[in-house]
Curated annotation (Swiss-Prot):
Pfam families, sorted: Cpn60_TCP1
Lineage: Bacteria, Pseudomonadati, Thermodesulfobacteriota, Desulfuromonadia, Geobacterales
A Gene Ontology biological process term: protein refolding
PROSITE patterns: CHAPERONINS_CPN60 (PS00296)
PANTHER family noted in UniProt: 60 KDA HEAT SHOCK PROTEIN, MITOCHONDRIAL
A GO CC term assigned to this protein in UniProt: cytoplasm
Entry EC no(s): 5.6.1.7
Protein's UniProt name: Chaperonin GroEL
Highest taxon of the lineage: Bacteria
Entry annotated with the keyword Nucleotidyltransferase: no
Length: 547
């Protein structure tokens, strides 16, 4: 086992503080509307220019192992806040630095770190309750756009597009962010249920210009096995042909004789038909077929539940007002499923989302949920250069997360004002004298976000803090225009979830760092002397004539 380096007490805490300060000082310059850019060298390609706190934090690795531990702990604050709320990473970093810096001074002066941490925890609990208390639910399109605009570093276009996307697909809907081929940032929405499987043969196309099959008032056959044999499929084809309705077949696969017969019937005009593969794989495929069946009011024709393909009748088929199928996707619009059945299915998927511990499963379940309740919106991000594209895409994703957070838990005045307003709740806390130091640490730290926003805008932070503290409600400092305004009326708002998560995560990690008594790191290996050269090259004597 490799030898270790160990540091104790004040020496350990000082190393942590150096690391925390190095990382936080690099991150906090990006805070607020007048936040500065950070340029990051990349091992390949052009440098990355960003104003995103978590991106800056992720790039930082320090040479000193002990200082690096401090930096990595604060990095965890930024990452956790980003994961939970999607924004607030810089605020969380600023808070963590302020709490730890104040706390480390008190511990160095001989105060009990465990008691300080207890006071800290109780103060945070009271503050979180107060933030929820002053939170306002988000009501309309305009407020959603404001949250999106602020999280996208005051880019109004992005805010408006996110608000429009949420309006179209609902708060349960899936909104994805992709890179556009053009310069403009646009929004595309897909109504109804779409899955990523296209037609099995181009002969099914009804619109050669757009290369898609579009059919109205469609019957839908949903089968969970391969169809290769025509005789199994014949009875249902005959019934559908008699009814005169177009038919969409969704099955694990359709091949050989069955596919050839469908194509021939389509070309002869006997039957308007289209065949696609079932979406997903394994158990997820079964679940998605069941979703389609419920949405269209049909049944999954599966031998597992006693339905054979050859015995299928028209009443087992799903129905939809319209379907469109291109080479990659199938979209089912206005299925005939019963509303009560769809809501029951939605409830079941929501329960599974709450229970699952896998992020991948949760994402897939949310996609299924969105397909049942709303639809899917795609924000296509356009930019002039690749560097701008990456930066803009990251901002859109941030803004999207923050907007979802605002819809979840409401909004509070932005620009660090909410923390100053929530501070009054700390006056009522009756704690032991040592624990009261923890409360004082938090009080001082809560001023730090607004102080940093002001400093980044080139204004004296202390004057701004004092003026805003003496104001009421949403009165605060608009750093973008250098004026004092009602923050909510001016549209400077933060999602409650973001403010809450930033404070909780910062206090949690700062409290742990404060109560650290020892640090252990691997001892760096000493570089030995160069090994001797192989025989014949000793001293390279034979090359003397080259001097």
């Amino acid at each position: 086992m490799a030898a270790k380096l160990i540091k104790f007490d004040q020496e350990a805490r000082n190393c942590i503080l150096k690391g925390v300060n190095t990382l936080a000082d690099a991150v906090k310059v990006t805070l607020g509307p007048k936040g500065r850019n950070v340029v990051i060298e990349k091992s390949y390609g052009a440098p990355l220019i960003t104003k995103d706190g978590v991106t800056v934090a992720k790039e930082i690795e320090l040479e000193d192992k002990f200082e690096n531990m401090g930096a990595q702990l604060v990095k965890e604050v930024a990452s956790k806040t980003s994961d939970v709320a999607g924004d607030g990473t810089t605020t969380a970093t600023v808070l963590a630095q302020a709490i730890y810096r104040q706390g480390a001074k008190l511990v160095a002066a001989g105060h009990n770190p465990m008691e300080i941490k207890r006071g800290l925890d109780q103060a945070v609990e009271a503050l979180v309750a107060e933030l929820k208390n002053i939170s306002k639910p988000i009501k309309d399109h305009k407020e959603i756009a404001q949250v999106g605009t602020i999280s996208a570093n005051n880019d109004k276009t992005i805010g408006d597009i996110i608000a429009e996307a949420m309006e179209k697909v609902g708060k349960e809907g899936v909104i994805t962010v992709e890179e556009a081929k053009a310069m403009e940032t646009t929004l595309e929405t897909v109504e109804g249920m779409q899955f990523d499987r296209g037609y099995l043969s181009p002969y099914f196309v009804t619109d050669p210009e757009r290369m898609e099959a579009a059919m109205d008032n469609v019957a839908i056959l949903i089968h969970d096995k391969k169809i290769a044999n025509m005789k199994d499929l014949l009875p249902v084809l005959e019934q559908t042909a008699k009814s005169g309705r177009p038919l969409l077949i969704i099955a694990e696969d359709i091949e050989g004789e069955a596919l050839a017969t469908l194509v021939v019937n389509k070309l002869r005009g006997v039957l308007n038909v289209c065949a696609v593969k079932a979406p997903g794989f394994g158990d997820r495929r079964k679940a998605m077929l069941e979703d389609i069946a419920i949405l269209t009011g049909g049944k999954v024709i599966s031998e597992e539940v006693g339905f054979k393909l050859e015995n299928t009748t028209l009443d087992m088929l799903g129905q939809a007002k319209k379907i469109t199928v291109d080479k990659d996707n199938t979209t089912i619009i206005d299925g005939f499923g019963a509303e009560a059945d769809i809501q029951g299915r939605v409830k079941m998927i929501r329960a599974q989302i709450d229970e699952t511990s896998s992020d991948y499963d949760r994402e897939k379940l949310q996609e299924r949920l969105a397909k049942l309740v709303g639809g899917v919106a795609v924000i296509k991000v356009g930019a002039a250069t690749e560097i701008e594209m990456k930066e803009k895409k990251a901002r859109v994703e941030d803004a999207l997360h923050a907007t979802r957070a605002a819809v979840d838990e409401g909004i509070v005045p932005g620009g660090g004002v909410a923390y100053l307003r929530a501070m009054k709740v700390l006056e009522n806390l009756q704690l032991a004298p040592e624990q009261q130091f923890g409360v004082n640490v938090i009080k001082r730290a809560l001023e730090e976000p607004i102080r940093q926003i002001s400093q980044n805008a080139g204004v004296d932070g202390s004057i701004v803090v004092d003026k805003v503290k003496n104001g009421k409600d949403a009165f605060g400092y608009n750093a973008a225009d250098d004026v004092y305004v009602d923050m909510i009326e001016a549209g400077i708002i933060d999602p409650t979830k973001v403010s809450r998560s930033a404070l909780q995560n910062a206090a949690s990690v700062a409290g742990l760092m404060m109560t650290t008594e020892a640090m252990i790191a691997d001892k760096p290996k000493e570089e030995g002397a160069m090994p001797a050269m192989p025989g014949g090259m000793g001293g390279m004597g034979g090359m003397g004539g080259m001097m």
